[in-house]
Regions:
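Conserved glycine-rich Rossmann-like NAD(P)H-binding loop of the short-chain dehydrogenase/reductase
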Residues: 27-42
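The beta1-alpha1 cofactor-binding region of Rossmann-like NAD(H)/NADP(H)-dependent oxidoreductases
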Residues: 58-70
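NAD(P)H cofactor-binding loop motif with strongest signal on the N-terminal glycine-rich segment
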Residues: 8, 12, 160
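N-terminal Rossmann NAD(P)H-binding glycine-rich loop of SDR-like oxidoreductase domains
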Residues: 13, 17-22
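Hydrophobic positions on the long internal alpha-helix
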Residues: 84, 126-130, 134
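Catalytic loop of short-chain dehydrogenase/reductase
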Residues: 89-116, 124, 135-167
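Conserved hydrophobic beta-strands of the Rossmann-like cofactor-binding core
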Residues: 6-9, 83-84
Length: 167
C-alpha cells in the first residue's frame, strides 16, 4: 500500500501509547511499538495476532541513552514517518501518597531527576537520535506528548516535577 506510513510509538504497551498504537494499526499503517518491559505486553501480543504484518514490538528504555542508540541501530534502514514520544512518568507510586516529594520545601531531588530523565531528556535524546530516519520518512513528524497538568493555571494535581517536565 503506497500510503502506508511507519510510526514509532514510545510507551506503546499501555495507556495513551497503547491507544495510539491501536488507532494507527486501524488505519493500516506500520507501528514500531517501543516499550521498556517486554514482559508486560499482553495487549500488544493480542494486537499482533490481528496485525501480524504491521505491528513490530521493540525494546526501549527511554531513560537509557544506550537503549535509544541500540533501537536506532536496529531500525537503521527504516524511514520513519511519525515518531510519537509518549513514554512518561508522573513520579513514584502510589501517586497520591508521594506527591509531597515534588513540593517546594519537601522536594526529593531524586524523584525530580527521574521524572525529568523520562519526560524531558529521554524524548530529546529520541529526537536527536532518530532525526535522520525521520528526515527519510514522508511525513517527517515528531510528536511530543504534553499534559494539561503542565498548565500553570491548573495546578490542582500538585505533581510539580511532572507538570514542569510536561510544560
Amino acid at each position: 500500500m503506497s500510503d502506508q506510513k511507519k510510526y514509532l510509538v514510545t510507551g506503546a504497551n499501555r495507556g495513551l501509547g497503547l491507544e495510539f498504537t491501536k488507532q494507527i494499526l486501524n488505519g493500516n499503517h506500520i507501528v514500531y511499538a517501543a516499550c521498556r518491559n517486554i514482559d508486560d505486553i499482553d495487549e500488544l501480543q493480542l494486537l499482533s495476532k490481528k496485525y501480524q504484518e504491521n505491528l513490530i514490538v521493540v525494546k526501549l528504555d527511554i531513560n537509557n541513552h544506550d537503549s535509544i542508540v541500540d533501537l536506532n541501530d536496529h531500525l537503521e534502514d527504516v524511514a520513519i514517518d511519525v515518531m510519537i514520544n509518549n513514554a512518561g512518568t508522573i513520579g513514584p507510586l502510589p501517586y497520591f501518597e508521594n506527591t509531597y516529594k515534588q513540593h517546594f520545601g519537601t522536594i526529593d531531588y531524586d524523584v525530580w531527576s527521574d521524572v525529568f530523565k523520562t519526560n524531558l531528556f529521554g524524548p530529546v535524546k529520541m529526537a536527536e537520535t532518530f532525526l535522520e530516519q525521520i528526515k527519510k520518512g514522508h511525513d517527517k513528524k515528531m510528536i511530543f506528548i504534553s499534559s494539561v497538568v503542565g498548565s500553570i493555571a491548573d495546578d490542582h494535581q500538585k505533581a510539580f516535577a511532572y507538570a514542569t517536565s510536561k510544560t
